[in-house]
Amino acid sequence: MFDYTVEELAGWKAKHGQLYEVVVGEGEDAKKAILRSPSRQDMSYAMAVKDPIKMSETILNNCWVAGDEEIKNDDQYFLGAISQIDAIMQIKTAEIKKL
C-alpha cells in the first residue's frame, strides 16, 4: 500500500490545501490515495459529463495528488473509491431571505 512521509504531506497541503486520504479494501489488499478538494473548474468540467461514473472518474483524476494507481485502473478499487467521492465535494450551506 502507498505510504507517504510527514514532509510529503506538508508539501502537498501547502500546494493543494485541504486533502483527503481514501483507503479502499482491507489488510494487505488495501490501496490508498490522497485527493485534494475539487475546485469550481473541476466541478464544472465533471458536471458536463452525463454519465455518473464518468463524472466521478473525472473528479477522481482531477483531484488525484498521489497514491496507488490500482485505484484508478482496477474496477473493484475504482468503484470503492468513487463511492466516497461525495465526501470531498463539501459545499457550504447558504441561506436566502426576502427583504
Indicate where each model-derived feature is located.
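Short, surface-exposed, charged amphipathic helix/loop patches that serve as local interaction elements
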Residues: 24-99
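Short, basic/low-complexity N-terminal boundary segments at the transition from targeting/disordered tails
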Residues: 1-12
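Short, hydrophobic/aromatic-rich segments at coil-to-beta transitions
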Residues: 14-21
